[in-house]
Regions:
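Vicinal oxygen chelate
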Residues: 2-19, 29-125, 134-169
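Short acidic-aromatic low-complexity motifs
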Residues: 22-26
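C-terminal catalytic core of tyrosine-transesterase DNA break-rejoin enzymes
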Residues: 128
Length: 169
């Protein structure tokens, strides 16, 4: 009798798995492991010895990596010159994780700061050009507190942007 196959492959994957196109699968996999704590599930090499697929895991989430295939329209954020998507990564120590990512080659896009919805966040762009918002959940504001914090945060950001524009920064 043939083995019954789970069409959703729930033993390995969740409902949604991100797959990033990268310029160098092995280098990207190494960065995500060292910077964000992913674990390597598999890296598959093609006939030429270059990696054609990688699967990394973090707390039950899978991140797949694949190489650019221009003839199929598959290009990395680095090649595009901008991140076509952002990834939101929850970690226990956001400040440490952001600092580690920067040390390994990511670019910080501003300071790590407490956000109105209760997370402390920092944004980095990884060496492949993808934007990662790294966060630690630090508070659970009520909906009323969240609205108040949002207004305050938006007002302070607007004031900061106006000051930057006035100073020519």
């Amino acid at each position: 009798m043939p083995k019954k196959i789970d069409p959703l492959n729930k033993k390995i994957y969740g409902s949604l798995t991100a797959m990033l196109t990268v310029s160098d699968v092995k280098a990207a996999a190494a960065f995500y492991q060292k910077a964000f704590g992913f674990t390597k599930r598999a890296i598959m090499d093609g006939p030429d010895g270059k990696a054609v697929h990688a699967e990394l895991t973090l707390r039950g989430t899978t991140l797949m990596l694949g190489p650019e295939i221009p003839q199929m329209g598959s290009r990395s954020a680095k090649t595009l010159g901008a991140s076509p998507a952002s990834l939101y990564l929850l970690t226990e120590k956001v400040d440490k994780t952001v600092a580690q990512a920067v040390k390994l080659g990511a670019t910080a896009k501003g300071p790590v700061m407490d956000m109105f919805w209760g997370d402390r966040c920092g944004t980095v762009v990884d060496p492949e050009g993808y934007t990662w918002m790294v966060a630690t959940h630090v508070a659970e504001p009520t909906p009323q507190e969240m609205r108040k914090r949002m207004k305050e945060q938006m007002a302070s950001q607007g004031a900061g942007q106006a000051a930057s524009a006035a100073s020519g920064s």
